[in-house]
Amino acid sequence: MQKNNKGTIILPVIISLFIGALGTTLVFLNFSSNGNGSIIQNVNKVTITENSIADAVNKIYDAVVVVEASKEGKQISTGTGFVYKTKDNVAYILTNNHVIDNSDDINIIYSDGSNTTAQIVGKETYSDIAVLQVAKSTILSVAELGNSKDVKIGDTLFTVGTPLGKKYQGTVTKGILSGKDRLVEVSLSGNVTDYIMRVLQTDAAINPGNSGGPLVNINGEVIGINSLKLV
């Protein structure tokens, strides 16, 4: 995914999948920021302990935002995102490409109800990832990034998002990692398979509006992004 002519985002990704009434989560592998505008691989070990889920939620909560996309003055999409890094006076938000695609105005709403306008830094269709930027002075918190390779089957995971619109902003759902290394065929046109993604399986409930929100481990670290819902 190209960030623009100022830098490149290197983003190995997989998707996690739960087929049924739950959802699909796009998961970053070994990511962290190097402070130079890139996301790079990081192999630090994450020790997961069953501490209070409330503590983990509190750690990530204010970094999660509502993303409202509009075109010609009409709202066309609502999703979720999270602040993942800052540099100088700019803060960067990760969300899904399909949340902001075809929009000409993007409104960001923080957990305290304040809002600001975001600009698109880069986006990529296949991974369904978009990077937005806002003024650093507007944000409330920055998420801590974990390592999805360290998550084990049965580990507790949770999501924070905006299911069914901003009325339910900040909704938390909890589940476990149900499986690893699933392969899912993805079609952009609906007729043919365009590519195959390696996925993790989770039973954490994901609904429309959660797209772009974080999948989080028990330490309050982001290990993935909710990408789309399969039923």
Residue ranges and their predicted role:
Residues 73-75, 85-167:
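Conserved active-site neighborhood of the chymotrypsin/trypsin-like protease fold
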Residues 25-86, 93, 103-105, 109, ...:
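N-terminal activation segment of mature serine protease catalytic domains
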Residues 67, 84-86, 97, 121-123, ...:
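Residue-level recognition of beta-strand microenvironments
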Residues 23, 62-68, 81, 91, ...:
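Terminal peptide-recognition signature
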Residues 1-34, 119-120, 133, 152, ...:
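C-terminal recognition in membrane/secretory proteostasis and scaffolding
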Residues 31, 73-76, 103-105, 140, ...:
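Active-site loop architecture of trypsin-fold serine endopeptidases
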Residues 19, 23-24, 37, 51-56, ...:
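C-terminal cap/linker of serine protease catalytic domains
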